[in-house]
Amino acid sequence: MKKKEIIILCGPTASGKSYLGHEFAKAYNGEIINIDSMQVYKETPIITASPSQIYKTEIPYHLYNFLSITEDFSVIKYLKLAAKKIKEIISRGKLPILIGGTGLYINSLVFGYNNIPDITEDLQKQARELHSKIGNIELWNKLEKLDPLAASKINQNDTQRLIRAYEVFKQSGKSIFCFHTLPKEQILSEFNFKIIFLNPERKFLYKTCEQRLQKIFKEGSIDEIALIKKQLIPQDYLNLKAVGVKEILAYLDGNLTLDDALSATQIRTRRYAKRQVTWFKNQIKDKITLKYSNQEECTKILEIFPHLLIERNLKETQNTAPQCI
């Protein structure tokens, strides 16, 4: 029996994923599922460039802006939610289209994940309160005594990984890295994934990054982050690592001008986009890569989407503009 197909549309930030995925879903009876780790948070739809309300009224969107940044979230929790949504969409006779750029989520969904035990809410609270009280260096020192292996692999400045490693050891009595050596578990082995990687020419990508950031800064991201800063204490928004948050907080604290905050965010966004492209090129082998160097070529991708739904040798699509490899 032929496996049902799931589409993953991935690529760097500001590469056109949202627009292309939306048009694709409208044309081919699809529903969209988020596969971006920052777009799950409900407090930050603007800074994370989440789909607009107009988009959401045209077709169903799932797993966007549903979670508070004060809540703990993990790749395993995401996978369970995504698997449930995928099966529901297929049961309705529709096509699941996952859109995003978080490599860990994509890799875990397609190739399997390390089954690390769930952390109790009490332990999560204790770990965060401890970190808030003693800071990164002292928490790293505690981790080194408990789990030298994890401490040797985690930078003292990596707050989220430090807390996570501490939680896992306290919960299980084992290093988080011990779970990485076990066979990976597949959550959707009964389905076939077709991965489409959007890889715009770098100059064009950097231009779209700049345009998006200017729009985001003008359309409410400052107020969005100011509200979070007003309502929450810092330990409550450790999860919020979207590019631009740190820079806007620095502006709100009077440490950067608005122009400097925008400039710093643009630099960090370009670096982030470059890392994403490198990751997708090197880590996802079985994929269709679509290259384009301007908006017109990006839009033309919609013309070849029907061909991508058909099982075929990838060489057949190589001569179709935009370039497919």
UniProtKB/Swiss-Prot annotation:
Pfam family, any one: IPPT
Region (Interaction with substrate tRNA), start-end ranges: 36-39, 160-164
UniProt catalytic activity: adenosine(37) in tRNA + dimethylallyl diphosphate = N(6)-dimethylallyladenosine(37) in tRNA + diphosphate
Key words of the record: ATP-binding, Magnesium, Nucleotide-binding, Transferase, tRNA processing
Annotated residues for binding of ATP: G11, P12, T13, A14, S15, G16, K17, S18
Record GO biological process: tRNA modification
Site (Interaction with substrate tRNA): T102
Annotated Gene3D superfamilies: 1.10.20.140, P-loop containing nucleotide triphosphate hydrolases
Binding site for substrate: T13, A14, S15, G16, K17, S18
Statement: the UniProt record of this protein carries the keyword Transferase: yes
Name of the featured protein: tRNA dimethylallyltransferase
